[in-house]
Design a protein with these regions (language model features):
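Non-catalytic structural scaffold of enzyme domains
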Residues: 1-182
Length: 182
């Protein structure tokens, strides 16, 4: 992260910390949950960040390796049988434990938040890591008075540039005018 901050004189916000901070603020009597990709869960990054808030216990971490492929293949409606089955399979231990809040630790997972809420119930708070990061970045830009004027759109992806337009339309609800680059 230091290299990025040194190379670009712009505010940089990661996805992990803002979401974890919000989740930690919801800690109370009920356990908390974190769902993310297998690589993210296995890295221990969420665990280490939550430990900074004194939350060494009472957190259930669950890797959900089927979520991203399902979402990217168009299965994200709360009525979709494949998503409903995957949500139930991965989140059953959290439901049984009575978690009070779940961090959606992957940017894709916001697309299935309705299916997660349907399964877990409205009393379980869902925290979107991507929404928390966007809010933090927006706040930083306002503080630095960098919200006015015109900007330009530039999309960078670590994935396939050919898939970008289709996926962007799903995530954004509109088709970007420009394609993505690596």
């Amino acid at each position: 992260a230091g290299d990025i901050l040194d190379a670009y004189p712009l505010p940089v916000t990661g996805v992990l910390r803002p979401g974890v901070k919000t989740l930690a603020g919801l800690a109370g009597g009920a356990p908390l949950g974190v769902i993310a990709t297998k690589a993210s869960i296995d890295s221990g990054a969420f665990r280490r960040e939550l430990e900074r808030y004194g939350l060494e216990r009472g957190v259930i971490y669950t890797a959900c390796p089927d979520f991203v492929p399902l979402i990217e293949s168009g299965h994200y409606s709360p009525d979709d049988a494949l998503i409903r089955e995957a949500v139930a399979r991965y989140l059953r231990p959290m439901k049984d434990a009575g978690v009070g809040a779940i961090l959606l630790g992957c940017t894709h997972y916001g697309l299935i938040s309705a299916a997660i809420e349907d399964y877990m119930g409205a009393e379980t708070r869902l925290v979107s890591a991507s929404e928390c990061a966007a809010r933090e970045l927006s706040d930083k830009l306002r503080e630095l008075d960098m919200t006015g004027g015109c900007g330009e759109e530039r999309y960078l992806t670590s994935g396939e540039t050919g898939d970008f337009g289709r996926m962007a339309a799903i995530f954004l609800g509109w088709q970007p005018k420009r394609g993505a680059e690596h």
